[in-house]
Amino acid sequence: MFLLHEYDIFWAFLIISSVIPILAFLISGVLAPISEGPEKLSSYESGIEPMGDAWLQFRIRYYMFALVFVVFDVETVFLYPWAMSFDVLGVSVFIEALIFVLIPIVGSVYAWRKGALEWS
């Protein structure tokens, strides 16, 4: 039977951990001095006078590498619990994990063959 009072500590933690950052933002907004001007609107470059525009446009190639990294990073996060309980799980779960690993590998090989990962 599902009883909510069994999770009192969880709800208290959730409420407190939500209220503290909200209060911190509100208090800093009230106490912070409001000063606007050209210095506040310029970009900070370690004390050096900024040269040129602060907004750089990255090439799309960088985003492809970042996307591949994120895909394999998320895959690692999902495979970790499976690896920790590998001895308890059966062969069918092993086959599912193998398919789960093969799909991004096939996608990476496809992207590599198409030249999406070439930096030049």
UniProtKB/Swiss-Prot annotation:
Reactions performed catalytically: a plastoquinone + NADH + (n+1) H(+)(in) = a plastoquinol + NAD(+) + n H(+)(out); a plastoquinone + NADPH + (n+1) H(+)(in) = a plastoquinol + NADP(+) + n H(+)(out)
Keyword Transport recorded: yes
One Pfam match: Oxidored_q4
GO molecular function terms attached to this record: NADH dehydrogenase (ubiquinone) activity; quinone binding
Subcellular location: Plastid, Chloroplast thylakoid membrane
Any single Gene Ontology cellular-component annotation: chloroplast thylakoid membrane
Superkingdom as given in the UniProt entry: Eukaryota
GO biological process, one term: photosynthesis, light reaction
Subunit-level organization: NDH is composed of at least 16 different subunits, 5 of which are encoded in the nucleus.
UniProt function note: NDH shuttles electrons from NAD(P)H:plastoquinone, via FMN and iron-sulfur (Fe-S) centers, to quinones in the photosynthetic chain and possibly in a chloroplast respiratory chain. The immediate electron acceptor for the enzyme in this species is believed to be plastoquinone. Couples the redox reaction to proton translocation, and thus conserves the redox energy in a proton gradient.
Family: Belongs to the complex I subunit 3 family.
Protein name: NAD(P)H-quinone oxidoreductase subunit 3, chloroplastic
Organism: Liriodendron tulipifera (Tuliptree)
